Swiss-Prot record:
InterPro entries for this protein: Znf_FYVE_PHD, Znf_PHD, Znf_PHD-finger, Znf_RING/FYVE/PHD
PROSITE patterns: ZF_PHD_1, ZF_PHD_2
Function: Probable transcription factor involved in the regulation of floral induction under long day (LD) conditions. Promotes photoperiodic flowering by repressing GHD7, a major floral repressor. Seems to function independently of HD1.
Region entry Disordered, spans: 1-46
Gene Ontology terms: cellular component: chromatin; nucleus
Name of protein: PHD finger protein EHD3
GO annotation, biological process: flower development; regulation of long-day photoperiodism, flowering; regulation of transcription by RNA polymerase II
Annotated zinc fingers (PHD-type), start-end: 296-348, 420-472, 474-524
SUPFAM superfamilies listed in its UniProt record: FYVE/PHD zinc finger
Disruption phenotype: Late-flowering phenotype under short day (SD) and natural day (ND) conditions. Extreme late-flowering phenotype under long day (LD) conditions.
Gene source species: Oryza sativa subsp. japonica
An example Gene Ontology molecular-function term: zinc ion binding
Amino acid sequence: MGSQNRPPPPRKRQPPPPEDHLVTYKRRRSKETQPLPLMANGANSKKDAKAQHWISWRDTLHGFLQSPAISQGGGIQTCIRHALQHNPCLLTNGVVVHTEFKGNPAHSQGEEAKVQHPNGAAGGKVVSADAAIQDAAAAASSEANKAMCNNALFDILVSQKFALLCHLLLGTFHVNKPGDVIDLEKIDAKMRNGDYAHNPALFDDDIQQMWEKFEQVGQEMTGLASNLSTISRVSYQKQASGFSEAEVAEHRIEEISLPGAVHVVTKESTTTVQLAPCDSSHSTIPKRTVPPGRDLCPCDGCGTKVDVEEGLICDECDTMYHFACVKLLNPDIKQVPAIWHCSTCSFKKKELAADTTNNVAHDCLHGGNCVLCDQLELVKTEEEDPKLPIKIELAEEREGSSVSSMGEDNEPDLSTTALSNLCKHCGTCEDDDKRFMVCGHPYCVYKFYHIRCLKTSQLAIEQQKKLGCWYCPSCLCRGCFQDKDDDQIVMCDGCDEGYHIYCMRPARNTIPKGKWYCTFCKIRRAAEGMHKYEDSVLKIHGNSKHACNVNQSKDSEGDGTEK
């Protein structure tokens, strides 16, 4: 009985199982690495810019996981999940923790060892064992290639530059689905199909193509933004100044020819600039004065008007550009240069310096490229009185002048400038530093042109390299630059440039009757016609207003006498 009342012995306390320790370790590890609350706190404070772009990065990766293609698994889904588990906000020393994606090489090696040591297998199975070894080696190589591509993609996803790109798309451009812009579905599909496992170089090509697309879009956006900025500024100035489109079209015409007179019009400016005349003659070409209130020139780059204060003028041809347009083409230009030449004149100088044509001879002291000598040739002259009659003084032929000699039987009816050995455009003779280009057509009526008086399109050096000689704009079609069908070439009655009837716009089947004008001269004539119409309207309005004033004065006098 006593033994029955005896209390049971105390049980020994069992130690906790090792599984509890592992659970506690996992729970403690989970508590130490909580990237999302840290990033959320940074976003709420709005003081840590780094946390801002990492939040955009997190949202972008979550968007990738929600994509129907990537959510299938087997592709880059595992890599994205590992990137999300990585906490870039805790990196202080710039050390990136790499996650190694490996296949199961130990398992492969075990299988290989098992095949190599069959332990009692028959000798007839040696051939199948070798095939199994090769398959295992190929599988191991594929797994290694796939792991290498995953590691490379992981490094890209956890980089700060990628996070900044995500923040640019989400925070700046407010792209709802960055996955539509950053196209990873193609890479995911190839990763799932095993293309990268067989050829890992394809992964690098696809990644580079994606970034090159971003670079191209960025460059296009930069160029469009610069152009739109220039157009916006010029459009506002145009609306504020009140100039019409007809005036802009008139200013865009670089060369103009009126019936009975031939002259060159540079970009209009308030100062008339003339080449220094030679000793034997002076220019017989009348100057075109700038009408009052039209001292604004169009930019040769964008075609809109530009004020003299904000423009950049070529020191060779007086062509005006917006400084912003010049800076867009030449980003190295930071401020307005003291001496500047446009691209056309720069190309012309290079062509002259390279002696690309046999008709051009460089025997001047400085080789024809001295900017100072070019500047000294430009002299300011007073505007000629338009009421004075135009007189043509024939220049004496100087020694050494490059004049084409023809037989008397075949001599055509030359123009006054050709008979006087004068330039067709400026009406002055040839000089050491103003050399002639001589038209090689035997029936050319103009013959002589100063090189500096011709535009690059009129010289057409590249188009005439294969021809035996140089043809002027009147003797060679300006549409096709082909030395053929001279009987079908028609010269414009405004600028004397020649065109084949099938090169006209629109093309013709027969030679037009009466006068014919090219496209540029049609625009110029339309602008001149509008100006004449405006002047006639103002004249009629002025006369009627004057008549009304006279009638009102007579009525007031009559009322006074009656009183």
